[in-house]
Amino acid sequence: MWTNLVNGCHAALSSVVSSPTYTTPRNITIIGGRGRMGRFFTQQLTAAGHNVSILENEDWEYADHLLGSAELVIVSVPIKWTVDVIKRASQYLAPTTALCDITSVKTEPVQAMLEYHPGPVMGLHPMFGPNVKSFAQEKVVACPGRQDDSFEWLLDFIKSQGGEIIVSTPEEHDYMMVIIQATRHFSRFSVGVFLAQEGIDIERSLSMSSPSYRQEIDIIKRLFAQSPHLCVDIMLATQDRCQAIAKLADTYNRLASLVARKDRTALIQEFENAQSFFSEENISSPKLSQENHADRHLSRYRMPVVPNRS
């Protein structure tokens, strides 16, 4: 509850102190702009004074106008259609048009944009769902492709609204998303399916639960409040994700077999191995590595450090 309250205060404050400063209005077309994430970007960019047009599947007869005159085109369609849409849209774009996608997979889309469009290219991945009200306190991963300066105004806008830009290569992004998204979704998906299968009285369980259990149930509820197509597509998006989920399932089975055998010694050893991995020393090092990595790639896109006022 307190986390939601604090985040809500941050978002409200951001909307006051980060009112869009004057910017040159740009012509933007969002392919898939009536989808949930497409609507979010449409609302944010329109509120900032830009001219936003939408191209849906039934609008391709107008593509020459909607795409040919655009300064920025954002591809916001399901993962399985992204590359095909990039290929189709690119034939209408001017060489100076900036092209980006906002799907949760980056290697293939960025490669496709570089192959089919000679102009500015960047992959973006908003690390939040479409239910948020603003970019405040949210992260967006940016994967540079070509002519990065053409996207500087967009990234600066996201930062001005309280967002944080994390710079990554497409390959690093996809590697990290195997864990951040795919296996995490599968783990919570599995627990949700198990609870439904067992017919657990969730309300009764919450009445006698710990704070961590209530938090986990809230996270699972939010997962199942999403589109089932989106959740499944995230898990199945790449072969690497499917293989990682299979390995996670193998780990579950191996640990479950130890429980079935009541092998206390082996379970304690597994716990201690993981405990060592999650030690303070191991967890702090990647953060420093990430900061150094970002310094080497487009450091101008990083947010300034804001003193902790709590």
Located regions from the model:
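Phosphate-coordination loops involved in phosphoryl transfer and adenosine-cofactor binding
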Residues: 24-27, 96, 137
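ADP-ribose/adenylate-binding Rossmann-like module
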Residues: 93-108
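Hydrophobic Val/Ile/Leu positions in short beta-strands of Rossmann-like dinucleotide-binding domains
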Residues: 30-31, 75, 142
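Glycine-rich, N-terminal phosphate-binding loop of Rossmann-like dinucleotide-binding domains
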Residues: 76-78, 103, 144
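An accessory alpha-helical subdomain
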Residues: 169-309
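Rossmann-like NAD(P)-binding element
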Residues: 64-92
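NAD(P)+-binding Rossmann beta1-loop-alpha1 motif at the extreme N-terminus of oxidoreductases
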Residues: 2-65
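Rossmann-fold dinucleotide-binding core
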Residues: 106-109, 113-177
